[in-house]
Amino acid sequence: MKIVELGHAVLYVRDLERSRHFYGDVLGLPQITPTASGAHGPGAAAFSGGRTHHELLLIEVGPSAASPPPGRRTGLYHLGFKIGTTDDELRDAIRELQDAGVTITGASDHTVTHSLYIEDPDGNELELYIDVQPEAWREDPTLVMAPTKPLHI
């Protein structure tokens, strides 16, 4: 067997409508299915940027569900979403996030990406990034492990 690509992510969320609004309206990820009600199981919503049938599925688990544990631990660290190809698009994203009341928790120059970090309504960390000089990391994949620097845009 050989994995050929990462297909999709599924997140459990406390409040489907709140998360649907965040991923769909704030971040602009197109919702591709109607929001399913919880009448015959958990509520759910699927999203896709068009690369595949869906890149993100949200499943509602209710308000009493536990938050992701803080700090270093095993499990998912964050999801990364490519938002464009230029620092201008990253600057636009900063303005849009601030206008929507989203806190930017970090910003890094990873040599291969310029990245912003935020949290979704359930505390899942997200990386919003642009590729930097894709020809460089294609020629030298070790650049992915380059030291992280502060982002200055």
Residue ranges of model-derived segments:
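Short, charged/polar surface micro-motifs in flexible loops or helix N-caps
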Residues: 51-55, 63, 84-88
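Short, flexible turn/loop "capping" segments at secondary-structure junctions
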Residues: 1-3, 71-74
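Vicinal oxygen chelate
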Residues: 14-17, 74, 79-125, 130-136, ...
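Short, basic, helix/turn surface patches
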Residues: 61-63, 131-141
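Short beta-strand/turn micro-motifs at beta-sheet edges
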Residues: 64-70
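Histidine-centered active-site/metal-ligand motif
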Residues: 8, 53-54, 78, 110
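Core segments of cupin and vicinal oxygen chelate
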Residues: 12-60
